[in-house]
């Protein structure tokens, strides 16, 4: 037998009742077998159902249902999300110290003006910005604040990969994604994307692609608190190839 560490995120953490747990499995067990074991345990019906449409990571890398697990592996359970190398130059997110560019997570307020100004270079003809802010209502309910959490190691990897792909796909010069974590009030920036390019067309296209893809693939979750309650945002399902599901029961007999 072997033991693996399971890390549920977002609504799964609320339903499963722990930020991490150790699960004992037979040697050579797969991700699918782990999910089957969890689904068969004492979990709420809605949790067991959601386990059939999540993504799973093993040691901060996306995994397939067929991947074999090893003793000591860290397995992330990732419900649908809300929502190259980094250049050497650095930038400030808020009032803290400078950090490597392209992909940043921060608990500090995002200083959008500073980041946009830092993105402009002499060879650029356009800088396109997506500034996602917290609005005061959602689906007819008055919003008090949002709380964001992330599987931080995997989220930064995915964000860096998105900026690298955007540069290659759209021919832009540079891109930066900054996402806020923790509690965010109405009117504050939750996510900032800044794209720099010689021409406006590629800059617009890259910026739209970055936010749309981030909302589907980066493990960041949003909990919305209203005047009359709180709920985890349903979010975007993971695309085919990232989501996993335990195998259906065999009908052979």
PLM region spans:
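N-terminal, polar/charged subdomain of small-to-medium soluble alpha/beta proteins
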Residues: 5-9, 13-15, 74-82, 86-190, ...
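Ubiquitin-like/PB1-type beta-grasp interaction modules and other compact soluble beta-rich domains
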Residues: 1-98
């Amino acid at each position: 037998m072997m033991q693996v560490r399971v890390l549920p995120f977002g609504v799964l953490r609320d339903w499963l009742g722990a930020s991490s747990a150790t699960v004992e499995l037979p040697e050579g067990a797969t991700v699918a077998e782990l999910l089957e074991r969890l689904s068969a345990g004492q979990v709420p019906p809605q949790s067991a159902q959601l386990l059939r449409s999540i993504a799973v990571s093993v040691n901060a890398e996306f995994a397939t249902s067929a991947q074999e697990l090893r003793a000591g592996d860290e397995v992330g359970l990732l419900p649908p999300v809300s929502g190259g190398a980094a250049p050497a130059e650095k930038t400030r997110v808020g009032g803290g110290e400078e950090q490597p560019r392209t992909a940043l997570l921060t608990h500090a307020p995002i200083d959008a003006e500073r980041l946009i100004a830092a993105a402009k270079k002499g060879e650029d003809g356009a800088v396109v910005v997506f500034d996602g802010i917290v609005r005061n209502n959602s689906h007819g309910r008055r919003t008090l604040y949002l709380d964001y959490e992330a599987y931080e190691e995997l989220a930064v990897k995915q964000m860096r990969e998105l900026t690298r792909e955007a540069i290659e796909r759209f021919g832009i010069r540079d891109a930066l994604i900054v996402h806020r974590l923790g509690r965010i009030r109405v009117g504050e920036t939750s996510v900032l994307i800044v794209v720099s390019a010689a021409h406006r067309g590629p800059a617009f296209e890259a910026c739209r692609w970055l936010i749309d893809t981030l909302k589907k693939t980066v493990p960041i979750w949003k909990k919305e608190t209203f005047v009359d309650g709180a709920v985890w945002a349903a979010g975007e399902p993971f695309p085919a190839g990232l989501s996993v599901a335990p195998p259906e029961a065999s009908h052979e007999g």
